[in-house]
Design a protein with these regions (language model features):
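Short beta-strand-to-loop acidic/aromatic patch adjacent to the donor-nucleotide binding site
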Residues: 1-5
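Short, small-residue-enriched loops and turns at beta-alpha junctions
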Residues: 6-8, 112-113
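Glycine-rich beta-alpha junction loops
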Residues: 32-35, 109-110, 118
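Glycine-rich phosphate/pyrophosphate-binding loop and the adjoining helix
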Residues: 101, 108, 125
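Hydrophobic helical membrane-anchoring modules
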Residues: 111-136
Length: 136
């Protein structure tokens, strides 16, 4: 599964997603999370007293892979039982809500999601740069 809003996917990532899915039945592109996450206080949304250690976090994106039969059965169950599909069609969260263990595959920081003007500027910089510099 891949979305067209991430056009800079490379062969190494695709190969690892396929390999991990062949071994375990699914694969989710991921990277370590390098920012700090703080939990908003219930008393005051402009404050915090709690953080989530970044070592416990992974950033996930597309591509992702699932064995077709398992994915089809999961969607049928999710719609039938209204599980994991509340306002979202994101496959990974649905699968976790259904109790599935997800397996991480290699990701890439260059696999950016084009949603803002800044993303487009970064995309333009990547595609106008020398391919040997960044397409590795």
């Amino acid at each position: 599964i891949h979305d067209g809003i991430r056009p800079l996917i490379d062969a190494d990532v695709l190969t690892d997603v396929i390999d991990v899915c062949n071994r375990y039945g699914n694969a989710v592109t991921s990277l370590p999370y390098n920012e700090q996450i703080f939990v908003i206080s219930q008393e005051d949304a402009s404050t915090t007293k709690q953080y989530v250690p970044r070592e416990q976090l992974r950033r996930v994106s597309t591509p992702q892979a699932y064995r077709y039969g398992k994915l089809l059965d999961a969607y049928r169950k999710a719609f039938r039982e209204n599980i994991g599909i509340h306002g979202s069609s994101y496959t990974n969260t649905m699968m976790v809500d259904l109790g599935e263990t997800l397996h991480f595959a290699k990701g890439s920081d260059k696999n950016i999601k084009l949603t803002t003007k800044g993303d487009l500027e970064l995309f333009k910089a990547y595609i106008t740069a020398d391919e040997d510099t960044w397409l590795k």
